[in-house]
């Protein structure tokens, strides 16, 4: 109550932000008359002037009014479009590192050019991130003339792009690309063996389009570059045969007895599958008969955990994954469907054997499992950018998460024209069939009035079921789903024509614009060498259709079910009512819908049945709407807990990733690492000596023979240590250490002379090779640790603390192994001629190219769903989160006197910084 009174007096935070930016808008508008008078060359020269002023110390904030005025003038001349005042506010929002929520059709793509141009003045590059390759290339091609008029270069990156072309795209002032491509290129750069092989410049500023999709919906899926691992396809086939015979046991209330015992339980809310006692017995018996498990052996014995992993993967494939819902079969391959966008995700594979289990289930060829070579998450990748911003039509419902995870505030940008769309209350039916009948009836009615209708569905399966019913009713329509995505542009272009009916999954929700009367630009583009008369005729026909649709009430949206997230529902609604057009939206639900069945309360179900509803009758009541929104909030809260938890675990790996990648880049950039190698060699030799001659020990405790053998076997250096002791009675522990160390230094210097000029390259290449190999093994070990860490809760231990402790110990082991392995290899390496070196480099490049083509770029199903679930965040843990300022990193490199990111508490130079000298 008190908050409402304060808001009525002072306005909301959003209102105050808009008011502040409004003053800048006034200033930009006043500059317009000055920039109109400039010639094209003078306008282009403004960019060089701005760059010079910025280099001389003038901030981008101070340049903003003039830069925005220049960008608007260039847009007017080149594109024929003048930025609205609200787009100027949106551009400022992006520049300040915030998220701009702007309604569909209000011009987000054009708005982004303002912030992109201003930040490109720094010369450090700007990345504009979109959700798919089509949008990235479309936006880049569309906006290139505008940037060129201002003297800036533009590039776009996409998968399987030639390396030189991609390097040029990253060198451009403004680079367009998908979140996947930017993320994978970052990982690939941190696998490069030469600095010339890296693509990206140091990251500077990113504008993320559809930011809620990328930073929230995609946040739970790690980016993984992987290589092939061992083949176990026969095991998948063998286990797949007996999974269908297993029965589900119903989950009952506490104290009740299940009507029938089953082999597994399924919790649809958390998508978790667990074997029951009876299930374990049946599976162990079946595996024993099949010769996969020894007699009297347990499935939970240490040596059989891999077998258990396969069983759970197969069980999940049959119980949690359904064809035409979570995946489709295309060209004899399992192709995943993005639940948020409805689009296929070609090339993306589930991790931990799930994809292989799906291939076995569908009787397809089983592709080999993979081993992680490099990984990160979008959450951690995008937090590397010193400045991050985003734009979307639906962000306000997730403002809390944006602020607490990414430090990004959401600013709701007002529409240029008032919204004319009518959002009707939901209609709720008892059964799915009754719901479908009502939809068919209303679609027919709207169509008869000349109203275009968009029927939104949540899955391919529902879209096909809806299509069958419209066919039976003889209603012509188009279907847009993951199977028909090739015709997407054509279907969307015609979706706004009078009486057209389009069924679409969520893929029609982003990056698409349904124009009332049809897409005029698409029609004109079809004409070959058109005359003025032909163009005028097409425009006249379009105007007639447009006016007809507007008079009929605009585009009507019918939602066939509510999505888990309110944002997805709002995106569907947002297809109607663009730029002040009329429109209407309504959702048709049933008690059999997944969201209602799983999350809605039993009280609502019993209420609807108790009021005696007739067949085909719908209820439209505020209590029902409230219950649905409550269910959605419940799901959104649960998903936020998952994402927060993943971030907490990945932050541990991310700290280690920062150390490794920082050292790797220092190695690549260094001309030579001789001093670092000398320091590492001193540490390694001291460790080896201490293993056989303990510090502050007496001679009787020394294992001199063991030390001689170790130095000979491991490092190829024969030292007569026992003879030294026999010949010199004065040799004590300290002087002996010095003598051994000096002898090893001399041996290495002889090796350096033998290697000649090649030693500089060899030291770097060996260090990189060993580092990459150990990091790859470390990632695999971290995966295994993460999968089982949830079980520590049963031992009254905090899984997160245990994960941090053990992963730190593993990381320490990695760094020690790195030192020892590098020095051992350098001592034993043989000299090569220049011809041999050139041949080795040629083979390395060929192998790198083969590996690049073999690499799988995939998104794991995160977190490990075969692992025991970790405890969700408690309300107390959530309350500890405090709003952060926009995320700004001090630089890409850890300072030598900064605390080491590994968490040891020591300075970086005294801890892991020692590795790079």
Swiss-Prot record:
Q: Reaction catalysed by this chain?
A: ATP + H2O + cellular proteinSide 1 = ADP + phosphate + cellular proteinSide 2
Q: Which SUPFAM superfamilies match?
A: Helical scaffold and wing domains of SecA (SSF81886), P-loop containing nucleoside triphosphate hydrolases (SSF52540), Pre-protein crosslinking domain of SecA (SSF81767)
Cellular component (GO) terms are: cell envelope Sec protein transport complex; cytosol; plasma membrane
EC numbers:
7.4.2.8
Q: Where is the composition biased (Low complexity)?
A: 862-876
Which molecular-function annotations from GO does this UniProt entry contain?
ATP binding; metal ion binding; protein-exporting ATPase activity
Record's keyword terms, sorted? ATP-binding, Cell inner membrane, Cell membrane, Cytoplasm, Membrane, Metal-binding, Nucleotide-binding, Protein transport, Translocase, Translocation, Transport, Zinc
Top EC class for this record: translocase
Task: List the PROSITE patterns.
Answer: SECA, SECA_MOTOR_DEAD
Q: Name where it's found.
A: Cell inner membrane; Cytoplasm
Reported function: Part of the Sec protein translocase complex. Interacts with the SecYEG preprotein conducting channel. Has a central role in coupling the hydrolysis of ATP to the transfer of proteins into and across the cell membrane, serving both as a receptor for the preprotein-SecB complex and as an ATP-driven molecular motor driving the stepwise translocation of polypeptide chains across the membrane.
Q: Which family does it belong to?
A: Belongs to the SecA family.
Q: How does it assemble?
A: Monomer and homodimer. Part of the essential Sec protein translocation apparatus which comprises SecA, SecYEG and auxiliary proteins SecDF-YajC and YidC.
Under what name is this protein listed? Protein translocase subunit SecA
């Amino acid at each position: 109550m008190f908050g409402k009174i304060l808001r009525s007096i002072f306005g909301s935070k959003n209102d105050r932000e808009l008011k502040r930016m409004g003053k800048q808008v006034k200033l930009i508008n006043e500059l317009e008359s000055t920039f109109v008078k400039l010639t094209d060359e003078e306008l282009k020269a403004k960019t060089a002037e701005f760059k010079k002023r910025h280099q001389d110390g003038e901030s981008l904030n101070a340049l903003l009014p003039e830069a925005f005025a220049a960008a608007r003038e260039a847009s007017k001349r080149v594109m024929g479009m003048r930025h609205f005042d609200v787009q100027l506010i949106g551009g400022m929002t992006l520049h300040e590192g915030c998220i701009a929520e702007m309604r569909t059709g209000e011009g987000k793509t054009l708005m982004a050019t303002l912030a992109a141009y201003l930040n490109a003045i720094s010369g450090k590059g700007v990345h504009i991130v979109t959700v798919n390759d089509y949008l990235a290339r479309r936006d880049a091609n569309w906006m290139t003339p505008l940037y060129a008029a201002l003297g800036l270069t533009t590039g776009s990156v996409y998968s399987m792009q030639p390396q030189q072309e991609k390097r040029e795209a990253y060198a451009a002032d403004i680079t367009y690309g998908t979140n996947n491509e930017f993320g994978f290129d970052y990982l690939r750069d941190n696998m490069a063996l030469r600095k010339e092989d890296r693509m990206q410049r140091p990251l500077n500023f990113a504008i993320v389009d559809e930011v809620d999709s990328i930073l929230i919906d995609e946040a739970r899926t790690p980016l993984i570059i992987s290589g092939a691992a061992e083949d176990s396809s026969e095991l998948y086939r063998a286990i797949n045969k007996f999974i269908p015979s297993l029965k589900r046991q119903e989950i009952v209330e506490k104290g009740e007895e299940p009507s029938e015992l089953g082999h597994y339980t399924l919790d649809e809310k958390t998508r978790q599958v667990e074997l029951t006692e009876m299930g374990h017995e049946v599976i162990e018996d079946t595996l024993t008969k099949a010769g996969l498990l020894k007699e009297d052996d347990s499935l939970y014995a240490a040596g059989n955990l891999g077998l258990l992993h396969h069983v759970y993967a197969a069980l999940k494939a049959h119980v949690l994954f359904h064809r035409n819902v979570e995946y489709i079969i295309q060209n004899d391959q399992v192709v995943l469907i993005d639940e948020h966008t409805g689009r296929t995700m070609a090339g993306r594979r589930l991790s931990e054997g799930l994809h292989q289990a799906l291939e076995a289930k569908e009787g397809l060829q089983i592709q080999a499992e993979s081993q992680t070579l490099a990984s990160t998450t979008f959450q951690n990748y995008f937090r590397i950018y010193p400045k991050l911003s985003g734009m979307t039509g639906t962000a306000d419902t997730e403002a809390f998460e944006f602020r607490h995870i990414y430090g990004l505030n959401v600013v709701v940008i007002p529409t240029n024209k008032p919204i004319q769309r009518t959002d009707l209350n939901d209609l709720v039916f008892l059964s799915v069939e009754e719901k479908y009948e009502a939809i068919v009836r209303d679609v027919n009615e709207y169509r008869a009035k000349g109203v275009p209708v968009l029927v939104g569905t949540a899955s391919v399966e529902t879209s096909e079921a809806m299509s069958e019913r419209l066919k039976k009713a003889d209603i012509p329509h188009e279907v847009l789903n993951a199977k028909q995505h090739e015709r997407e542009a054509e279907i969307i272009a015609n979706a706004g024509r009078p009486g057209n009916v389009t069924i679409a999954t969520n893929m029609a929700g982003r990056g698409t614009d349904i124009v009332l009367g049809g897409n005029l630009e698409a029609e004109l583009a079809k004409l070959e060498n058109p005359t003025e008369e032909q163009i005028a005729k097409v425009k006249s026909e379009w105007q007639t259709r447009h006016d007809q649709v507007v008079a009929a009430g605009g585009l009507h949206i019918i939602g066939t079910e509510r999505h888990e997230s309110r944002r997805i529902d709002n995106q569907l609604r947002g297809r109607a009512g663009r730029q002040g057009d009329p429109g209407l939206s309504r959702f048709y639900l049933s008690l059999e819908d997944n969201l209602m069945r799983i999350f809605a309360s039993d009280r609502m179900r019993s209420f609807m049945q108790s009021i005696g509803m007739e067949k085909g009758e719908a209820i439209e009541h505020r209590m029902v709407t409230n219950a649905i929104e409550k269910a959605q909030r419940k799901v959104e809260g649960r998903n936020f807990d998952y994402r927060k938890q993943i971030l907490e675990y990945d932050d541990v790996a991310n700290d280690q990733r920062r150390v490794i990648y920082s050292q790797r880049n220092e190695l690549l950039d260094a001309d030579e690492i001789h001093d670092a190698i000398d320091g590492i060699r001193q540490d390694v030799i001291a460790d080896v000596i201490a293993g056989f001659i303990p510090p502050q020990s007496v001679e009787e405790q020394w294992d001199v023979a063991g030390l001689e053998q170790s130095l000979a076997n491991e490092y190829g250096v024969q030292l007569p240590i026992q003879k030294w002791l026999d010949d010199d009675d004065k040799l004590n522990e300290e002087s002996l250490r010095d003598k051994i160390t000096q002898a090893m230094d001399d041996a290495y210097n002889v090796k350096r002379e033998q290697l000649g000029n090649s030693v500089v390259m060899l030291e770097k290449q060996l260090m990189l090779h060993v580092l990459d190999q150990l990091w790859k093994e470390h990632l695999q070990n971290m995966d295994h640790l993460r999968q089982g860490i949830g079980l520590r809760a049963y031992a009254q231990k905090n899984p997160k603390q245990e994960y941090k402790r053990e992963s730190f110990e593993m990381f320490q082991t990695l760094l020690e192994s790195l030192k020892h392995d590098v020095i051992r290899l350098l001592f034993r390496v043989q000299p090569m001629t220049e011809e041999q070196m050139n041949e080795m480099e040629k083979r390395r490049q060929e192998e790198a190219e083969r590996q690049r083509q073999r690499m799988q770029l995939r998104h794991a199903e995160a977190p490990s769903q075969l692992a025991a679930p970790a405890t969700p965040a408690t309300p107390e843990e959530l309350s500890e989160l405090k709003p952060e300022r926009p995320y700004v990193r001090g630089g890409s490199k850890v300072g030598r006197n900064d605390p080491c990111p590994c968490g040891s508490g020591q300075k970086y130079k005294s801890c892991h910084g020692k590795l790079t000298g």
